[in-house]
């Protein structure tokens, strides 16, 4: 079930403060965050976030198509290594 419209989108307060501070200064530095649950707002367009994936911070550049999604959607947590080939020759 989606979030109620009367509540509005969830964004961590510290993340919103960092974006507002950069918008006031006119700078576009990378913002490091562990907040994968924060919703991307229109104020975030043009900023680069370093979103934590459990091991490292993945750079995510926000454009207008990402508005309304969560930051964690663009930093995958699992790396697919491929399926193991069936080794029937070695079992004989």
UniProtKB/Swiss-Prot annotation:
<comment type="similarity">
    <text>Belongs to the universal ribosomal protein uS19 family.</text>
</comment>
<dbReference type="InterPro" id="IPR023575">
    <property type="entry name" value="Ribosomal_uS19_SF"/>
</dbReference>
<dbReference type="GO" id="GO:0000028">
    <property type="term" value="P:ribosomal small subunit assembly"/>
</dbReference>
<comment type="function">
    <text>Protein S19 forms a complex with S13 that binds strongly to the 16S ribosomal RNA.</text>
</comment>
<dbReference type="Pfam" id="PF00203">
    <property type="entry name" value="Ribosomal_S19"/>
</dbReference>
<dbReference type="GO" id="GO:0019843">
    <property type="term" value="F:rRNA binding"/>
</dbReference>
<dbReference type="GO" id="GO:0006412">
    <property type="term" value="P:translation"/>
</dbReference>
<keyword id="KW-0689">Ribosomal protein</keyword>
<keyword id="KW-0694">RNA-binding</keyword>
<keyword id="KW-0687">Ribonucleoprotein</keyword>
<keyword id="KW-0699">rRNA-binding</keyword>
<dbReference type="InterPro" id="IPR002222">
    <property type="entry name" value="Ribosomal_uS19"/>
</dbReference>
<dbReference type="GO" id="GO:0003735">
    <property type="term" value="F:structural constituent of ribosome"/>
</dbReference>
<protein>
    <recommendedName>
        <fullName>Small ribosomal subunit protein uS19</fullName>
    </recommendedName>
</protein>
<dbReference type="GO" id="GO:0005737">
    <property type="term" value="C:cytoplasm"/>
</dbReference>
<dbReference type="InterPro" id="IPR020934">
    <property type="entry name" value="Ribosomal_uS19_CS"/>
</dbReference>
<dbReference type="GO" id="GO:0015935">
    <property type="term" value="C:small ribosomal subunit"/>
</dbReference>
<dbReference type="InterPro" id="IPR005732">
    <property type="entry name" value="Ribosomal_uS19_bac-type"/>
</dbReference>
